[in-house]
Amino acid sequence: PTPKLLQERGLAAVHEETVDPTIGYATAWFEEPSGLDDDWGVLATLPAIPNAPQMGCVIRFPTRRRLHCAVITYGKPRAPRSPDELVARLAELDVPQLHRLLQRAKPVSEVESYGNTQNRWRRYGSLPRFPDGLLVIGDAACSLNPRYGQGMTVAALSADRLDRELGSYLAQHRSLQGFGAHYQRSLEDVLKVPWQMALLEDSLWVSHFSGRAPSLTERLQQASSGRLLRAAFTDIDTYIRFMRVAHLLAPPTTLLTPRTLMRMLSQAPEPAGNDAPGIGPA
């Protein structure tokens, strides 16, 4: 691993930030049952702190007559090990439609599970020295909870930043000496927003499972993101803005329009003990 390599070369240890919401992630493929005429592409539920630590998602591939099902559970759960167990887990959700659908579907794969889901950011850009001839990119620099679907997008944005920085650096310096340190500092600007978005909800789950009461800032973030999500379900302009931010196509400031803010403020607060989920695509 790169941190060990750098220390072996006598360089400072890289600072690492880790936020682990302890989720289990399991997926499987199913054959679409006959008679499924509804016009939809994705069915999903979202978790809610503290009483609904589980989410389910079914993605439809109609041309192949396939359904891809995922179950994500916070709190170190035992992952489903068979399609039958995965379908049974869907029965625990408050929304019964997913379970009913998969009961009619035929499994066509084994269950694949994944447990290495923590958010981890290694801050190579803050090192006082960084060797030439080395770049750290993708999950090696920053890995994110896969629930939010940001990993490949962040890798693509990082590669785009590399392309632009490489051209401008060569034009200015006529050499790549010092470029590694320069790029790692520039990369931090790319990673900042997706990192903050992932932590909006994941930090609350960490607080919940540790028994620590969320801070005032965390509670305000949770309340505002919950109102935003409910507004996105009822207003098409808010929905489009929300999805562009969630998929890293636009900055979070895109949501700070008078119409969006008014839509958020008009949403009724969630009942106590059933807080809305934080920002993040299903």
What are these regions (language model features)?
Residues 66-74, 142-153, 215-232, 282:
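Short secondary-structure transition/capping segments
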Residues 9, 93, 105, 246-249, ...:
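Alpha-helix boundary/capping residues
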Residues 64, 77-190:
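FAD/FMN-dependent oxidoreductases across multiple families
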Residues 1-94:
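Predominantly flavin-linked oxidoreductase catalytic cores and closely associated redox partners
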Residues 164-282:
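C-terminal helical "tail/cap" subdomain of flavin- and related membrane-associated enzymes
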Residues 28-30, 58-60, 69, 90, ...:
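Generic structural hydrophobic/aromatic packing signal, biased to beta-strands
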Residues 3-4, 83-84, 157-160, 222, ...:
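A structural signal for well-ordered alpha-helical segments within the folded catalytic domains
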